[in-house]
Amino acid sequence: GLAGSTCAKVLSGAGHPFVLCEASGRPGGRAVSDRTSDGFVLDRGFQVLLDSYPAARRHLDFTALGGGRFRAGAMFVGGGRPRCLENPLRRPPALFGALRAEVIPSGDLLRLLRLVTKSLGPGGAEETFSTGAMLRRYGFSETFFTRFARPFFGGVLLDPELRTSAEVFFGYLRRFVTGRALIPARGIGALAEQLVAGIPQGMVRYGMRAEKLVFAEGGVCGVRFANGVFLAGDEVILAVDEPAACRLLGSGRPRAALATAVHYFAADRPFYRGAWLCLPPRREESPVLHAALVSNAAPSLAPRGAHLWSVTVLPGHPRAADAELVRAEVASWFGENPRLMRPLAFIEVPYAVPEQLPGFRRRPSPWGV
C-alpha cells in the first residue's frame, strides 16, 4: 500500500538495506487503478489526493503525476438548475454568489466560516463529539445537513450518518481549505508507482502475502509468507490494515470497517463544463452520495472523445448496485437521457477505512503498542 511504499522510499533514500513485500502483483494496496480494454482508467472508489498533506508534498512529485485538480467548491444539483458555488476563502467575491444562490442558508454559511477558522487554529479537535453532534452544537440547519454535510462530508468520511469523530472532520476540513483535490493523469495508482519507481531492482517483491510472524527471544525475527518463503530480518515493519495486523500479531480485534462503492459510466459528451463535484440533496430512497465527471479534471482518464463519470453510492443501500437507477438520477440533474451514460463497472471496497468514532485516539491499542 501507500504506507509501505512510502516507508520503502525513505529507507532507500537513507541507504538502508530492506525488502518490500507486497501481497498483490503491484504496489498501491487499495489505491490502485485499472485500465479497461477501451481506455478508461477506473480507481477503486472515488479517490483524490489532497495536495495540502505535508507527507504528500515531501514524497510525491505533483508535476510528474500530471492530471488535474477539482474546483474548490461544488455544483449543487437535483433541486432545479445546477448551481456552482466556489470556496469564498479562495475567492472572497464567491461569498456573494453563495448568498444569492440560496442553496445553503446564509446563517449556515457564516457558521461554516467559523468552523473553517477553528480548523486552521489550535484546539480544533472536539474529539469527544461525533461530526453530526458537533455540527448541531454549532446550530447548523437540516437544510445544511441535507444539501452539504451528508453528501459532501458523508462521502469524504464514508459515513453519511456523520458518526465519525469531529476531530477527523476538522482534519479534513483544514486540508480542503488549504489545498486542492488532485486526480493523477493515470489514476490514483500512479502514487504508489511513483513512490517505488526509484527503489533498486530486487528490493520489491510481489505476490508475497504475509502468513505468520516468526518470534525469537521476545522479538520478531522474520516473516513466513503464504507461498512458503521465509525472510529473516533485524527489523520488521508491518504496513497492513488492522485485520491483517491483528491476525499476524495474534492479538486484539480490529475496529469496524467503513465501506465505499462507486459506479463508473462512459459518456460521449459531458453534461457540464468544469472540474466540479456534484452534490445532490441527501434522500433516503436514493443510494447516490455524490458524482463527478472525473475526466473534466483529468481528461486522460477517458479515451479521446469520451468522458468518464464516477458516482459514489452508499454500499449498504438496497439499490446501491442498480446502475439503471443511478444513471437515471444523475441524468435527471441535467435534463439528459440516461442512455447517454454507458455502465462500465460497479466497484465495492468493503474495507476502505477503519471506523473512527469519538474518542478513538484514547482507546488502547489492540496490540499494546
Region spans (language model):
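Mid-domain catalytic core of redox enzymes
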Residues: E211-E324, S332-W333, R363-P366
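N-terminal Rossmann-fold NAD(P) dinucleotide-binding loop
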Residues: G4
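Mobile amphipathic helical/loop "lid" adjacent to a hydrophobic cofactor/ligand pocket
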Residues: Y53-R57, D61-L162, F176-T178
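Glycine-rich FAD pyrophosphate-binding loop
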Residues: S12-S37
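FAD-binding beta-loop-beta segment adjacent to the flavin cofactor pocket
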Residues: P299-P303, I347-V369
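Helical element adjacent to the flavin cofactor pocket in flavoenzyme catalytic cores
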Residues: F169-N227, L231
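Short beta-strand to alpha-helix junction loop
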Residues: Q47-P54, A125-F129, Y138, R174-A197, ...
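N-terminal glycine-rich dinucleotide-binding loop that anchors FAD/FMN and/or NAD(P) in oxidoreductases
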Residues: D34-R58
